[in-house]
């Protein structure tokens, strides 16, 4: 049966690559016609099957952010990004508020209220979409950890820094006290332009992408075009 007929809220996940980065508007329109509740947009980290040749250019991120922010304001469904924390910086630069509350909760599977144009929370917002949903304010080692099927503990699925092994190691202790987790949660340890950026606390760049490209999880986000302006830290 159609999920909507069962009053289930539907989320659609899309990976942005060189093949579809120029089709964001078309995809957004298609999803609008399907009455979904959430569009989750994933930006590639060049590991595993996320091969380098599918990775978009830094300037294409900005173009993608512009279209996603447009649809976040216009569509009835919410939009969030994964592995693109610099989308929060884009939203702030363009007058949005990544911490803004979403529209009032709809009943399960119901179409959103017509005319609802509240600012949607961008990636990283700590606001809940509902009391049953985990907050969006998570990142590598910050609000999330990954435990493999064989017990290896990592800061995230795309950040293969081995920090322990369950059940020998307590996942709580690893999360709270392992040096890698503590480092990832400290924006003052960021390097390069990320370390100098006034958006380092609200953004901080993709630590998984930095590690995949440079081998250093605290290196600058390799796919960001923003040049820090030396202003106060946001």
Q: Where in the sequence are the language-model features?
A:
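Radical SAM enzyme [4Fe-4S]-AdoMet core and its adjacent flexible, acidic
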Residues: 1-140, 146-150, 158-162
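Short, basic and Ser/Thr-rich N-terminal targeting/leader segments
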Residues: 140-141, 202
